[in-house]
Regions:
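Short, small-hydrophobic-rich alpha-helical interface motif
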Residues: 25, 39-50, 70, 140, ...
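Solvent-exposed, charged amphipathic helical/linker segments at domain boundaries
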Residues: 138, 148-237
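Helix-turn-helix DNA-binding module
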Residues: 121-122, 133-150
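Short, basic/polar amphipathic helix motif occurring as a linker/hinge flanking DNA-binding modules
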Residues: 78-102
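A short, charge-rich alpha-helical start-of-domain segment used by transcription regulators
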Residues: 3-27, 37
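A short pre-motif secondary-structure segment
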Residues: 126-127
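Sigma70-family region 2
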Residues: 7, 44-63, 81-84, 165-166
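Hydrophobic-face residues of short alpha-helical interaction/recognition segments
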Residues: 25, 29, 67, 71-79
């Protein structure tokens, strides 16, 4: 979605109608892209594309498959733009992947989601759609733009590769020292409510996107004030989410601090140039394949 797209009443009403589908769309896109944040960005683009094409939608057919088709195409576009190849995809769950201290027991579907990252996009899509989302071969063929025979062949190839694949090898991704330094400084000043000090870290032309709420110049937003007014106690921390350094918002539940939401910061020339906050997307952070908290309070 473009940076200055207004969240008008009609678009927000459209989002309201597909509320139940969004977590499933995100789950699919995050496994296709290898990142819960990239996955949500792709979903956002797909939903805005769907909104613009509503006049082309045949309302006699289910809405879900139509949205999945758009989201799938956006995932493929994303992978092509990034030049993602199999070698890179095998590390997409992050270096030294560490699950939270008390990870949930994974069902078959969730386990499959984590394993398919080693597969090429078409095989990955077919396995996710069949084994996780329970689509028929006919539906899968339509979603991925293939024949039933082609979808079945991709599904069988993917399953064979997964059955023969060894345990994934943990790898180490080079840490961006500049990003790490700025994120820790950002978190420290944010937790101290040092708003003036934070503004020193942010470039004059920085962009802010609070998903589903705001998209535009940072200096035109009430971002800091919105956090300052929140009643539920919160703290920020630096964490690796799906292998990417990010800012995680921790919220206090009784005597325990729990991860609640995530924000991605982009840095150029020692200044923060873009912030994407997923605070209003509660399905994003729980979908992460790995999260390593650097300085949990």
């Amino acid at each position: 979605m473009e940076a200055h797209v207004p969240f008008d009443a009609r678009y927000l009403a459209f989002l309201e109608t597909i509320t139940q589908l969004r977590p499933r769309l995100h789950r699919y896109c995050s496994r296709m892209t290898g990142s819960v944040m990239d996955g949500e960005d792709v979903v956002q683009d797909a939903l805005f594309e769907a909104y613009r094409k509503l006049d082309q939608y045949d309302d006699s057919r289910p809405l879900g498959p139509w949205l999945f088709r758009i989201a799938h195409n956006r995932c493929i576009d994303f992978l092509r733009r990034r030049g993602v190849r199999v070698e890179a995809e095998t590390t997409a769950m992050g270096p030294d992947s560490v699950m939270p201290a008390t990870p949930p027991v994974l069902g078959v579907g969730r386990a499959v989601e984590q394993l398919v990252m080693s597969l090429p996009p078409k095989e990955r899509a077919c396995i996710l759609l069949k084994d996780v989302f329970d689509y028929t071969l006919e539906e899968i063929a339509e979603l991925v733009g293939s024949t039933v025979g082609g979808a079945k062949a991709a599904l069988n190839r993917g399953r064979s590769k997964l059955a023969a694949s060894p345990e994934p090898v943990k790898s180490h991704r080079e840490v961006n020292a500049e990003l790490s330094r700025l994120l820790h400084l950002y978190v420290d000043r944010f937790n101290k409510r040092d708003w003036d000090g934070l503004r020193e870290l942010i470039s004059a032309d920085a962009q802010l996107r609070v998903v589903d709420r705001f998209a535009g110049p940072f200096d035109e937003s009430p971002y800091f004030g919105n956090y300052d007014r929140q009643r539920v106690p919160w703290r920020l921390t630096v964490a690796e989410v799906d292998g990417e350094l990010a800012v995680v918002v921790m919220r206090q539940h009784r005597d325990e601090w729990r991860p609640d939401s995530v924000a991605r910061l982009e840095v150029i020339d020692q200044h923060i140039t873009r912030i994407v906050d997923y605070a209003h997307c509660p399905w994003v952070l729980p979908s992460a394949s790995s999260m390593v908290v650097a300085d949990c309070p």
